[in-house]
Regions:
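Alpha-helical segment of the N-proximal tetratricopeptide repeat
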Residues: 15-44, 48, 93, 100-101
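Cys/His-coordinated zinc-finger cores
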Residues: 192-203
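TPR-adjacent "capping" and linker segments in tetratricopeptide-repeat scaffold/adaptor proteins
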Residues: 3-21
Length: 205
């Protein structure tokens, strides 16, 4: 049993060989926040020792850390969909598309983490630490899935209601690449504007 220093307090069931050749090098990568490099080392170890509980747990942990890093990057960015006033919503199409793609990356990596955990639980179903970690990852996946779905629904449904032409300049709108503003004009109707056209409207008023 080996306890990893400074990362988490879960005992790892690894042989001395696994510890020397894979766990210790992976933890050195992780100490420098290179979780992708750490995961590569662990995956190499699992190619040689596919049933190692310790390496499987490290795989799930480093997948989680990669997902967490992407999530932190996204939280530092401006929100791609944000209200400007009552009944007015600004949508940055390019950033929304980018963020939806990054959400998918996070979901995939967390799915890989969950898969590694499930492999451990097949061998050792009463491992409380691993069971708790799986519950945590499941809750993360559920939250991300809801956020992604809400963003996708706003992004895809709103243009269907508002149409494809800017009220200001009457030119076509590319929702995938342009920043646009939706303005509610009644309980069932929406206007859509290019952001510069909407700003011009504000300057006139």
């Amino acid at each position: 049993m080996v306890t990893t220093a400074g990362a988490f307090n879960v005992p790892l069931k690894c042989t001395p060989e696994e510890t020397k050749h894979f766990v210790e090098p992976a933890m050195r990568e992780a100490e420098g926040s290179n979780f992708t490099g750490a995961l590569e080392v662990v995956n190499d170890g699992l190619n040689a020792h596919p049933a190692s509980e310790g390496l499987l747990f490290l795989r799930s942990y480093f997948c989680y850390k990669i997902a967490d890093s992407i999530s932190s990057e996204l939280s530092a960015l401006p929100k791609p969909i944000q209200p400007l006033a009552e009944g007015v919503l600004m949508v940055d199409g390019a950033m929304t598309n980018q963020m939806l793609g990054r959400f998918q990356e996070i979901v995939k990596v967390l799915g890989d983490a969950e898969e590694a955990i499930n492999e451990i639980l097949q061998v050792n179903p009463h491992n409380n630490e691993v069971t708790a970690f799986r519950a945590y990852i499941d809750s993360k996946l559920q939250k991300l899935g809801q956020e992604s779905e809400n963003m996708r629904m706003t992004f895809t449904n709103t243009p269907n209601i508002a149409g494809n032409f800017c009220v200001g300049c009457r030119k076509n709108i590319s929702f995938d690449t342009q920043t646009v503003v939706f303005r509610k004009t009644s309980s069932t109707q929406l206007e859509v504007w290019h952001l510069p056209c909407f700003k011009q409207l504000g300057n006139k008023n």
